[in-house]
Structure formats: C-alpha cells, structure tokens
C-alpha cells in the first residue's frame, strides 16, 4: 500500500514537471511569434520619428525594431516566468548576437554598422554593482554563520521586559534593520520562530488581530528595510547603477523612504487589525556568548559599512578611489581569510541567480541604448503622455510598478523597466532620477499578495494569516507607498 502511494506521488510529480515544461515551451513559442509579429509591423509602418541622419537607412530601422522585439520577448519571458528568470537573463546576450543587433558608429567621417561582439554583450555581467552585491552576500553569510543576526534580534526583543507592544514593535524594528544588510527572505525566515514563540502564549482565536499584526509586520518590515541600502534589495542596485549612485548616495534617498514607510506601516496594521497588547509575555532567550570570531565579525561589518558610507572621504585620504565594489570584495576576502565564514558558507548563502539577473538586465540596457531602441520607445511613450502634468506621470508610474510587482519578480521588473523609463524620462523632460528611483524603490513595495514577495509567502505559510488579511492591509499600504515614494522622489529631484 505504501509502495503504491509513493509511486502515485512520484507519477504526480512527474506529470507536474511535464506540464510545467510544456507550458514553458508554449509560452516561448508564443512570445517568439508575438515579438516577430511586432518586428514585421514596425518594419512596415515605422510609427516613430527617425533622426535626420538615419532617414532612408533601412538597416537602422531593422536594427531598432529588432531591439524593440527583443525587449517584448524578454518582458513576456520575465513576467510569465516560462523559464527561470535567470535563464531569461542569460538568453539576452545570446539573442542579441543571433538576431544580428548592433550599433552605428562614425569612423573617418563615415557611418558604419557594427554587430555586437559577445564580449560587449557579456560586459554587463562584470559590472561593479554585481560585486557590491556579492560582498553584501558575503557579509550576510558571516553574520548568519556566527549567529550574530539572531543574537542582535534576541537582545533587542529581550529589552521589552514582558511588554507585548514593545516586543512586537521590537521584532519589526529588528527585521527592518537586518533587512538593510541581509536578504529580506533570510531575515523574515529567521524572525518568524521568534515571533511564533511569543504568539504561542496568546489565544489564536481571541487574539487573532495580534497574530496578524506581528506576522504581517515582519513581512512588511523585511521589504521596507531592504530600501535602506544598495545591498538591501536587488532593484536598488539596478537603479543605482543606472544613475551612477554610490552606497552613500543611495542611503540619502532610500533611508528616508524606509523611515517614513515603517511607522506608517505599523500604524496601518494597528488601525486595521486592532491587536490586543495588554498581555504580559515571557521572552525566551538563547545564550549566544561572545567569541573571538563573533567580535571579529562585528568589526568587519562595522568597518565595511563605514567604508561604504564614507567612501568619498576615504578616497581623498588614500589617494585612490574607494569604490563600493572594492570595499565589498575586500570584505569578502577578509571574511574567508580570518575564518569567520568559509567559501562554502558564502557560496551557499549567495543568490547567484540574482547576480546573473543583474548582468542580464545591464546587458539589455546596453543593447537598447546602442541600438536606439530605448530612444525610439521613449519618443513613442512621450507622444502618448507628453501633455500630462509631471506629478501625474510620477504617480502613475509609481502605481504601475507597485501593482505590477504584486504579480511579477521585483528584480526582473526593475531590470526590464529601469533602462526603459530612464529614456522615457529624458523624452518627457523629466529628471531621469525621478522615474528610475520610483521604479527601483517601488519594485520593493508589494504588500498585497502572498506571492508578491518571499517574506509575504513565509508568513502566509504559517496558516495564521489569511489572504484577505494581506489584501486588506496590502491595498492600503500600496496606496500609501504610491504617495510616499512618488511625492518624496518628485520633491527631491523636480
């Protein structure tokens, strides 16, 4: 009987894998046909203005249209996740070469067409921002291996002195702070057992509002905390790279948004779910003693954060540029050399797919710019919404990205849309920083659905939070985020 049930389970899994593969193949074929159809239509109608020097140049028109068709294909693949989004990222340089996309260059007074070389198409995968993020993963690995993340969390929660309100806010605060430096997913997963330990002392039925407040507080604080630093969330790095922002420059933008959204989130959750904080609770503590390695880890963390924040001043002192990536790689080298984490630890805790996704997004950006596809797309969008007031455009873009990432990967959305909206901003005479930062920050502000972010899925998986709870609170927070992100960035750069 047992053997039969195991066989049935294996067959069910196999059928599921086959149906998933079939779905992926069908979507790839449909995406290819739709993209090719767009290419044919654009070649026949040419519904956009062409620079005077390219009028009558059919090769230029075909090159632009190939770039736009590639953009559509990648968009369908990333949003549908027909294959893993990392694989789609790796497709981008391959497709650019196969499709014969290139750029026009002037040589000896004459204009000639040059096909993309594979080395050019792959250059995005060696971008310094990728290594900055890798250093962030190495730092997070060291904190996790030495249990310093948990030690900090337990210490702050223990300060509540049995006060449920203070403990609840403390859990959310720790989640937010750790998420500035550690993966949002890892932070939420680590904080969940601490929260469940507190909630186990309450009545699940009578204190349901308290359950939902604390659990959603953890999920949302993890997402909000990721806004504070470049390494907090992948979309931050994508936007920062487009704007050539360093670690400190990003913090000047991301940190205020984080500090505004955090209290608004807790207030919103309190008003909606009306938790009962009158209970006295017992805080379970775990003895994590200070060791030489833990002290060294704290020192490495503090020095790395200091170097990131004060990179410009350090550059002036040392006489060479202290780049974010240089600091990150130095931290990774030190971490392994002094033995506070092994290479295996770092490799296991690094999300390599995110790093490749970065590279694919940067490759796509280069292809769109060099083929003039992004310029043409910007003109077309500008013609449609060019008469709208700037503040309306800003709020519409904020709403678009925030609700879009309820259904799609925030990193993939940012990788696709940041280069596009950078060009659209120029065509609309809007400072590029406004739309790029709205895409970069807004991509992390998805609060409404369990599938929107890993932290949402983690707390939903406990069974204590219903989807209607998340939708109710998330809708309000999405609207708040649209206003906060849109208005703050607009006021900063308009």
Where are these regions (language model features)?
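Juxtamembrane helix-boundary/capping and inter-helix hinge elements in multi-pass membrane proteins
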Residues: 144-148, 158-163, 198-211, 239-249, ...
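Alpha-helical transmembrane segments
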Residues: 201-212, 271-288, 337-346, 431, ...
């Amino acid at each position: 009987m047992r053997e039969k049930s195991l066989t049935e389970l294996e067959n069910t899994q196999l059928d599921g894998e086959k149906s998933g593969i079939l779905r992926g193949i069908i979507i790839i074929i449909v995406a290819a046909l739709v993209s090719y159809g767009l290419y044919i239509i654009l070649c026949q109608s040419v519904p956009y203005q062409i620079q005077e020097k390219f009028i009558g140049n059919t090769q230029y028109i075909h090159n632009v249209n190939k770039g736009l068709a590639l953009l559509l294909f990648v968009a369908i693949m990333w949003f549908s996740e027909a294959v893993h989004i990392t694989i789609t990222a790796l497709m981008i340089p391959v497709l650019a070469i196969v499709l014969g996309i290139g750029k026009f260059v002037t040589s000896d007074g004459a204009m000639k067409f040059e096909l993309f070389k594979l080395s050019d198409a792959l250059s995005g995968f060696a971008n310094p921002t990728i290594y900055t993020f890798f250093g962030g993963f190495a730092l997070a690995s060291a904190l996790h291996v030495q249990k310093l993340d948990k030690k900090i969390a337990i210490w702050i929660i223990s300060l509540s002195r049995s006060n449920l309100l203070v403990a609840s806010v403390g859990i959310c605060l720790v989640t937010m702070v750790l998420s500035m430096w550690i993966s949002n997913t890892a932070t939420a997963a680590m904080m969940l057992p601490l929260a469940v330990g507190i909630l186990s002392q309450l009545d699940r039925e009578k204190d349901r509002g308290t359950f939902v407040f604390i659990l959603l507080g953890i999920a949302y604080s993890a997402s909000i905390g990721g806004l504070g630093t470049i390494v907090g969330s992948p979309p931050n790095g994508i936007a920062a790279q487009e704007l050539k922002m360093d670690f400190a420059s990003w913090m000047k933008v991301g940190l205020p948004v984080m500090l505004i959204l955090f209290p608004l989130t807790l207030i919103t959750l309190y008003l909606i779910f009306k938790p009962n904080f009158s209970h006295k609770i017992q805080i379970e503590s775990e003895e994590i003693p200070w060791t030489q390695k833990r002290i060294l880890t704290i020192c490495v963390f503090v020095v790395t954060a200091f170097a990131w924040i004060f990179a410009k001043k350090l550059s002036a002192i040392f006489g060479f540029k202290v780049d974010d990536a240089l600091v990150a790689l130095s931290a990774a080298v030190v971490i392994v050399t002094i033995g506070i984490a092994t290479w295996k630890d770092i490799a296991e805790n690094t999300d390599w797919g995110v790093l490749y996704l970065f590279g694919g997004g940067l490759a796509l950006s280069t292809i769109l710019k060099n083929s003039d596809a992004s310029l043409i797309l910007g003109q077309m969008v500008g013609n449609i919404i060019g008469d709208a007031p700037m503040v309306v455009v800003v709020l519409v873009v904020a709403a678009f990205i925030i609700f879009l990432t309820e259904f799609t990967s925030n990193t993939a959305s940012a990788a696709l849309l940041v280069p596009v909206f950078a060009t659209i901003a120029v065509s609309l005479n809007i400072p590029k920083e406004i739309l790029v930062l709205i895409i970069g920050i807004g991509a992390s502000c998805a609060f409404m659905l369990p599938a929107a972010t890993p932290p949402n899925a983690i707390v939903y998986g406990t069974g204590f939070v219903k989807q209607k709870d998340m939708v109710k609170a998330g809708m309000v927070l999405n609207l708040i985020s649209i206003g906060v992100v849109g208005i703050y960035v607009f006021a900063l750069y308009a």
